Amino acid sequence: MNKKIRVRYAPSPTGLLHIGNARTALFNYLFARHHGGDFIIRIEDTDRERHVEDGERSQLENLRWLGMDWDESPETHENYRQSERLPLYQKYIDQLLAEGKAYYSYKTPEELEADHAKQEAAGIPPHYINEYAGMSDDEKAAYIAERKAQNIEPVVRISVDEKAIYKWNDIVKGEIEFEGGNIGGDWVIQKRDGYPTYNFAVVVDDHDMQISHVIRGDDHIANTPKQLVVYDALGWEAPQFGHMTLIINSETGKKLSKRDTNTLQFIEDYRKKGYMSDAIFNFIALLGWNPGGEKEIFSREELIELFDENRLSKSPAAFDQKKLDWMDNEYIKNADFAKVFELTKPFLLAANRFDERAQELVKLYQPQMKSADEVVELTDLFYGDFPELTDEAREMLAAETTPLALSTFRAKLAELPESDFTVENIFPLFKATQKETGVKGKMLWMPIRIAASGSMHGPELPETIALLGKEKVLAHLDAALNK
C-alpha cells in the first residue's frame, strides 16, 4: 500500500460500547497497527437528540480496557468532535450552494410524509420529489418567498444524478454498485437546525483527516453511494471502503439485536462480570476474521502480526456466548494468580467473603471460573447451606458400595488432628480407603465428592476437603450416611 494508512473509529456518544462497535474499532485498530498506520478516534455527536451524558468517556474507557490505544483523538487534538467542526461543514455546504450542486428545500415533514405514503401505495420505493420541478424562475422565487413568510426553515439538499453509477471495490465484498436513481433522490446534507447530516459530515471529516480506508459494518453499505455523491460534488478522492458482515446470534441465527436481553452485548457488562480484557479482545478479533488453522487463542501482538484484511469473512459472524465463556476460562486458568485474585476481589468483598480463606479458595476455583463473578457461586459451599443434590447425585449415593466407602473414609479423616488436616495428609486416605474396602475409581471418589461438597463436579477433592475443614466435612459425611 503506497498511501499512508489512516483509519478511524467514529462512535456516537449515544450509549455504551456494543460488541458490534467494539469489533469495528478492533478491526480498524488491527489494520492500522499491522500496516504501521494511524488509528484515529473521532466523535460523531451531531445527533443531539440521542446524545448521552458521559457517553464519550464511556466509549473511550471501554476501548482502553480492551487494550486499544490510538494516535489521535479528542483528548489530544482539537476539533475531533463533529460539534466542534460546524464552521468547516458550513464552508463546504456554502461551496456546493454557490456551485449549484446543492439547494435549499422548503418541503415540510408533513408534505414529505404524504409524498412517501403515495409512493408506498403505488409500490414505488420512497424518494424525494424535487419541489422545484417544472417551475419557472419567477414561480420558484414566489414559492420560496411564500415559504419564508410562513417561517418554514429550509434544509439543504445535494443534487443527485439519477443516471450516474456509484461503485467501489469493497475490501470485503468486492465490486458493489448503485444506480443514482436508487438512493432516494436528492438527500439532505444540512438539517433545519443547521447541523450537517451524518452522510455529509463523515465525508468532510474523512477527507480533512486524510482517512485512507473506511472499515465498518455492512449496515453502512447503503450510505456509501450517498457519500460518493459528496466526494464527486466536491472533487475529492474517496477512501477505500470495506464492509464487515453482520454479527448473528449463534442460537437463533438472527442478527444480534440490542433488544435481545438474553445475551450480554455491551463491553461494560463483561467488565462488570469480571471477564478478562485479553479474552474479549481475542474473541472479538475472531468475529468475522480468521488467520487460518485450528488455533484460537492469540495474544494482542500475534493478532496484530497476523491480521490480513483479505481474510475478512463474507459470511455472517456468529456470536457464541458459550465460546466466549470457554475462551475466558482459558485465559483465567492460565493467568497469573495475582491477576485473577485481583479480578475476583470486588466480588468477594461484595459477598462479604474476603477473609483468611479467600486466596486459597480463588486458587482452588481458578481453573473452573468462566468469569470472575462466578467466584461467589463457586464458593457458596464454604459459606452457605449444603446444596440440593441432583437426582443423578442421589442415585450415586444410593449405590451398594457407598456406605462402606463413606464410613471408612470418614473414620480415617476423623483420626487426623486439626493441625494435620492438610491436602498432603488427606490425599493418601483415598488410597488407604480403596485398599481396605476394595471400592475404587469412580465408585470411591464420586460418592465422597458428593457427600462432602454436594456436587458431582468441582476442583481437586483433597483441596476442597482441606479448605472445608474437618468439622464441616465430617458433618457432611455423617449427613450422607444417615440418609
UniProtKB/Swiss-Prot annotation:
Positions of ATP binding: K258
PROSITE patterns: AA_TRNA_LIGASE_I
Any one biological process term the GO annotation gives: glutamyl-tRNA aminoacylation
GO cellular component: cytosol
Lineage top rank: taxon: Bacteria
UniProt enzyme class: ligase
Subcellular compartments: Cytoplasm
Location of the motif 'HIGH' region: 11-21
Residue span of motif 'KMSKS' region: 255-259
Keyword list, A-Z: Aminoacyl-tRNA synthetase, ATP-binding, Cytoplasm, Ligase, Nucleotide-binding, Protein biosynthesis
Catalytic activity: tRNA(Glu) + L-glutamate + ATP = L-glutamyl-tRNA(Glu) + AMP + diphosphate
EC number: 6.1.1.17
GO terms for MF: ATP binding; glutamate-tRNA ligase activity; tRNA binding; zinc ion binding
Family label: Belongs to the class-I aminoacyl-tRNA synthetase family. Glutamate--tRNA ligase type 1 subfamily.
Role of this protein: Catalyzes the attachment of glutamate to tRNA(Glu) in a two-step reaction: glutamate is first activated by ATP to form Glu-AMP and then transferred to the acceptor end of tRNA(Glu).
Assembly behavior: Monomer.
Protein name: Glutamate--tRNA ligase
Biological source species: Lactococcus lactis subsp. cremoris (strain SK11)
Gene it is expressed from: gltX
